[in-house]
Design a protein with these regions (language model features):
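Non-catalytic, polymerase-adjacent accessory regions of viral genome-replication enzymes
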Residues: 1-41
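Short, residue-level hotspots on alpha-helical faces of the histone-fold
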Residues: 78, 82, 86, 90, ...
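Short alpha-helical scaffolding segments that buttress acidic/His motifs in well-ordered protein cores
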Residues: 15-19, 83, 159-164
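Active-site-flanking structural segment that lines cofactor/substrate pockets
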Residues: 37-67
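Short, conserved non-catalytic motifs in the polymerase core
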Residues: 22-30, 55-81, 95-107, 127, ...
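Short, compositionally biased low-complexity segments
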Residues: 5-22, 54-59, 86-91, 121
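Active-site-proximal segment of RNA-dependent polymerases
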Residues: 1, 85-139
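Conserved polymerase palm-domain catalytic core
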Residues: 39-42, 46-47, 99, 118-229, ...
Length: 236
């Protein structure tokens, strides 16, 4: 897993195709596609020289099933997100528990519901919980430490930090800081939050929650456990 593999032409082309899927009628994708070769060459050079800088987000709200602030990255940044996930997501995915169902190939909502119903038929009790303001509160220091356990290439870590930094404070108005015993000034002021809408945010959410998943399975001994993003259930 090397940084040069990320900006290789084949990977960038694959990333562009994924980013454009279902978006070809939208202006940002159409503008990029009009000069796609030039756009990818420019992006490749920026990544290779490490002068790539993420652009600003376009924000809007959805109201189903509840009000949420969505942050859409510029199209070229979405290409970079796909290029990064093409490279590192399979490595992390192999480390996830089988019963983590969000934003994973072969999983999804229907599979999660099927598994939930199977557990419900098998067990008498269930504890269902969710994480309040999961994306707005997500601690970058905790996330980067977890990523760095697997990703050792300093250039890849540089790119990850660039993408993470671009989303700092995007959701600051959505989250009231919660303090825990032992928190100091450094912990309180650490960067937090992942923009809802980024491919990387969905992936990094699973990376962030993976130690918790394994804690429930191994330390608590709860084999009948499943999670979908920030919602999870334990059966007994």
């Amino acid at each position: 897993m090397s940084y040069s593999s990320l900006y290789a032409w084949d990977n960038l082309w694959s990333a562009y195709r994924k980013a454009a899927k279902g978006k070809r009628g939208h202006q940002p994708a159409a503008t990029f596609e009009h000069q796609v070769a030039d756009q990818l060459v420019r992006l490749q050079a920026e990544l290779q020289q490490k002068i790539y800088t993420p652009g600003g987000y376009h924000h809007f709200y959805i109201h189903e099933p509840k009000r949420r602030k969505i942050s859409a990255a510029p199209f070229r940044d979405r290409v970079v997100h796909h290029a990064l996930c093409n490279l590192i997501e399979p490595i992390f995915d192999a480390r996830f528990i089988p019963d983590s169902y969000a934003n994973r190939v072969g999983k999804g909502t229907h599979a999660a519901v099927d598994r939930l119903q199977a557990f419900a038929r098998q067990y008498r009790y269930v504890l269902r919980m969710d994480i309040v303001k999961h994306f707005p509160s997500l601690d970058h220091a905790v996330l980067t430490a977890e990523i760095a356990r697997v990703v050792r290439d300093p250039d890849l870590l540089w790119l990850i930090e660039q993408i993470l930094a671009s989303g700092v404070n995007v959701l600051k108005d959505e989250y009231a800081m919660v303090y825990f015993p032992g928190d100091d000034l450094f912990a309180i002021n650490r960067p937090r939050g992942l923009p809802i809408g980024n491919l990387t945010s969905q992936f990094w959410s699973n990376v962030y929650m993976n130690p918790f998943d394994w804690f429930v399975k191994r330390e608590l001994g709860c084999s009948a456990y499943l999670r979908y993003v920030d919602d999870f259930a334990l059966f007994s």
